[in-house]
Amino acid sequence: QSYLQSKLLKVICEANYFFYGGNEKGEKLVLSVILSWVYIFLVCMLVGTGVLGFFKKKQFSLIYYLVAGVIAITVYAEFFSLFGKTGACAHGILLAGALVAGFINRNRLRQIWQEYRGVLFSWEGFFYCCFAILIAFFTSRGEFHTDTNIYHAAAIRIYEEYGLVKGIGNLQLHYAYNSSYLAFASIFSFKWLIGQSLHTTTGFLETIMCLYAFHGLRDFVRHKNHVADMMRVGILLYTLVNVIRSMSPATDYATMYFALFIMTAWCTNLFEGESDLTEFSLLSVAAVFTATLKFSSCLLILIAVYPAVCLIRDKKWKEIGGYFFCGCII
């Protein structure tokens, strides 16, 4: 019996290392990173379709659903942290809400799958998968941002174990920065499940933004205007410079990726799209969210002037009220 128990314990330990493999340096196995990304992708996608599902007559590109999901989940984590820790209970409620949103918008999800299925099962999709594995490798091991060792990881742990603590900035000045990204990182840290924070959210954002850039650059030759293409190249260059720090849940990286995405999507809509006012308005709401990631990006909110003027000119008061409400909630 003792022999069987020891063998069973050995199997459990080996399985735990295979799926996680964490150590005191924050290193983890590539497989654990990829599995966490798949889960984060699915949850963000379900929540994002629930949020953008209010626009019943409009279909968005995949990245818009993911970004909407990230924003909505971050706002949820922030509000939940006012009352308790972002642990198993918070995650269970989030998952239940995501499943309900997915069920309600199942037809929209089916349309998205049919649109992108051909890309996934192609050489282009193979390249995307290889690139994701490459980023997963750097997310599994590398360097922490300096501020991560100072307060990022500690602030995430406070979210995980206590929630938002009133006046904590008096103990450590950096806690008072209160970046919303740390709330998002905490709810997908999975410490409540595996006993140690994974810190894979930066790599996730890095991957989806780079794939968004690659997908847009595939039609580079056919584009008459290359302003948006240069913005896509900017995303890739930023990743190239900071790829070895992909494992760090730093607020700087999330802020830059969202800022670059907003500028790229804005230029895409302006120069390659139909200058859709709805997309301009949603990107303005995303700019408000970016300011909550790091206040130094607050000037990005000035892009909201253009859609605001257009909406007021067309007397679309209902839409104005909706976007203003979203900005206040964020």
Identify the meaning behind each predicted range.
Residues 10-16, 21-115:
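Membrane-embedded, hydrophobic transmembrane alpha-helices
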Residues 76-81, 243, 278-295, 299-306:
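Membrane-interface alpha helices of multi-pass inner-membrane proteins
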Residues 89-90, 200-205, 229-235, 241-268:
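Multi-pass, polyprenyl lipid-linked donor-dependent membrane glycosyltransferases
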Residues 96-98, 261-263, 289, 299-312:
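Hydrophobic transmembrane alpha-helices of multi-pass, membrane-embedded glycosylation machinery
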Residues 106-109, 118, 300-328:
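Perimembrane helix-loop-helix junctions
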Residues 134-228, 246-248:
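Active-site lumenal/periplasmic loops and adjacent helix-entry segments of GT-C-fold
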Residues 140-143, 184, 321-330:
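Membrane-lumen/periplasm interface segments of specific transmembrane helices
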Residues 221-222, 262-279:
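Membrane-interface transmembrane helices that cradle and orient dolichyl/undecaprenyl
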